[in-house]
């Protein structure tokens, strides 16, 4: 489209006809190369292709990185970048439900994030309260993974209420990782198992992969191991996230910062996953 029209409102009428502002075209109707209707068709086609594929990831984990850089690049306080948490995750959950993805795990706050400024941490804790209160009403099941006891008391109460209210919801399961670290998760699982051995509840020879996984915080999910990990923001590392569970996950890194991570970016990640051959340590033939 001509640059004259960039940033100008285009209003859709019936029959895929679009009208440009009267200051540009005198109120006449123009068919804008069907570009907008073609975009809608393309969007629907992508969703159908992905949804009809046998290679739908059951569990997608997301490291939501780049909020601070997004804000700083625009001369804004870092809090402005964090405000995209709820709307973007809501969009991701909505699209994932349509595609048939069953579990989303979002890395929202790590055990190391307490080292940030008290102003930023306090803002995030309030933001998480609002997040859980909002997601309580969305019809998805919501669970926390991570050390809840270190979180502010009010946030703990909101989380507990959200988990109780949504525990019977069918469909998508959203696991929020707050005060979470993969090393922490494995350590607390080890301590729990050691305590059970000490108390005579299990024997040493009973310890295996299955038993260990039952002590990880992700045990609340039907599919606790992610098929796909997405990291936004350009960094190519897993940053102490789901260390045990990611053993055979496909990794997808995108330069897109999380505030800009929308439907098209998520579709790109799913398409990338569907083009891969998962071998789980086996041979390629």
Swiss-Prot record:
UniProt EC number: 2.5.1.92
Residue range covered by the transit peptide: 1-30
PROSITE patterns per record: UPP_SYNTHASE (PS01066)
Any one Gene Ontology BP term: polyprenol biosynthetic process
Keywords (A to Z) from UniProt: Chloroplast, Magnesium, Metal-binding, Plastid, Transferase, Transit peptide
InterPro entries registered for this protein in UniProt: UPP_synth-like (IPR001441), UPP_synth-like_CS (IPR018520), UPP_synth-like_sf (IPR036424)
Record carries keyword Transit peptide: yes
One GO CC annotation: chloroplast stroma
Recorded GO MF terms: (2Z,6Z)-farnesyl diphosphate synthase activity; dimethylallylcistransferase activity; magnesium ion binding; prenyltransferase activity
CDD domains recorded: Cis_IPPS
Gene: CPT6
Entry annotation: catalytic residues: 65
Cofactor dependency: Mg(2+)
Location of this chain's protein in the cell: Plastid, Chloroplast
Family of this protein: Belongs to the UPP synthase family.
Function: Uses neryl diphosphate to catalyze the cis-prenyl chain elongation and produce the 15 carbon product (2Z,6Z)-farnesyl diphosphate.
Taxonomy, superkingdom: Eukaryota
EC class of the enzyme, as a word: transferase
Catalytic function, reaction form: 2 isopentenyl diphosphate + dimethylallyl diphosphate = (2Z,6Z)-farnesyl diphosphate + 2 diphosphate; isopentenyl diphosphate + dimethylallyl diphosphate = neryl diphosphate + diphosphate; neryl diphosphate + isopentenyl diphosphate = (2Z,6Z)-farnesyl diphosphate + diphosphate
One protein family per Pfam: Prenyltransf
Main location: plastid
Protein name: (2Z,6Z)-farnesyl diphosphate synthase CPT6, chloroplastic
Keyword Magnesium applies: yes
């Amino acid at each position: 489209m001509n640059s004259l029209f960039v940033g100008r409102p285009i209003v859709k009428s019936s029959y895929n006809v679009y009208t440009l502002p009267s200051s540009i075209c005198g109120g006449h109707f123009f068919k804008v190369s069907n570009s907008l209707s073609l975009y809608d068709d393309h969007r629907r086609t992508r969703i159908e292709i992905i949804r009809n594929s046998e290679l739908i990831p059951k569990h997608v984990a997301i490291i939501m990185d780049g909020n601070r850089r997004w804000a700083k690049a625009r001369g804004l306080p870092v809090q402005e970048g964090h405000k995209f948490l709820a709307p973007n995750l809501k969009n991701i959950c909505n699209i994932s439900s349509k595609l048939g993805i069953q579990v989303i795990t979002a890395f929202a706050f790590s055990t190391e994030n307490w080292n940030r400024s008290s102003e930023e941490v306090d803002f995030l804790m309030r933001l998480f309260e609002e997040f859980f209160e909002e997601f309580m009403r969305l019809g998805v099941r919501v669970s926390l993974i991570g050390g809840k006891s270190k979180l502010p008391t009010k946030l703990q109460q909101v989380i507990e209420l959200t988990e109780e209210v949504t525990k019977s919801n069918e469909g998508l399961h959203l696991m929020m990782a707050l005060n979470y670290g993969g090393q922490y998760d494995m350590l607390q699982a080890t301590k729990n198992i050691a305590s059970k051995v000490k108390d005579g509840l299990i024997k040493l020879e009973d310890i295996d992969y299955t038993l260990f996984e039952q002590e990880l915080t992700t045990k609340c999910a039907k599919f606790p191991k992610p098929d796909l990990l997405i990291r936004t923001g350009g960094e190519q590392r897993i940053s102490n996230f789901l260390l045990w569970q990611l053993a055979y996950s496909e990794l997808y890194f995108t330069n897109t910062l999380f505030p800009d991570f929308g439907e098209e970016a998520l579709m790109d990640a799913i398409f990338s996953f569907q083009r891969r051959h998962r071998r789980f340590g086996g041979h390629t033939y």
